[in-house]
Amino acid sequence: MTNVPNFSKVEASDSTKSDAIQLLLSTEADTQLLAQQLVTIIPSGSVWLSGDLGAGKTTLTRYWLQALGHQGSVKSPTYTLVEPYQIAQVAGGSKSVYHADLYRLQDPEELSFIGFDEYFNDPNALIIIEWASQADEYLPAPHLFIDITQLSNHQRQVHLQLSKIGIHAGLSLATLMSN
């Protein structure tokens, strides 16, 4: 049985479309359940996470990695720029996930020096980028945008928006909209 998030829908862009939705997360368990849903919504591709410092971007990513099957710790890539993960899959093989934090990036060209663009060559990889706005002219367009706004110590408003690339790839937020 699938866990159903217990978060409140603030708004959807249209009841017949599934390209954008806003959610209100009231507990950390809501964040964990959202991450479990994201595993099925976007199994691969690029996701841009935005939000103020402390909004919950790394927390969402940690739960997302755990929902994918990662067993170890999840470190914030603030100082390393990128934390790569190889997550064993039930069917065999592994899934590549790259968690990047570009907050401290001085020049987007730094990404080419570390081979960041190569991560996008794997069609099965999931690339989660915090502070992508620091290099938005360098990065390929994402499949999904997630913006997190901290309303209080316990509440966060999360806006999820599929890009045209995400819609073209057949992604849908309908799962979240029906809950």
Which residues does each predicted region cover?
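Conserved nucleotide-sensing/catalytic segment adjacent to the nucleotide-binding pocket
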Residues: 74, 86-131
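Phosphate-binding P-loop
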Residues: 37-44
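Short beta-strand-centered segment that lines the nucleotide-binding/catalytic pocket of NTP-utilizing
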Residues: 70-85
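Conserved lysine of the Walker
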Residues: 57
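Hydrophobic anchor at the beta1->P-loop junction of P-loop NTPases
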Residues: 47-49
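N-terminal pre-P-loop "Q-motif" helix
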Residues: 24-35
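Short phosphate-coordinating micro-motif centered on Lys-Gly-acidic
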Residues: 2-15, 19-21, 109-111, 117-179
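P-loop (Walker A) phosphate-binding loop of NTP-binding proteins
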Residues: 52
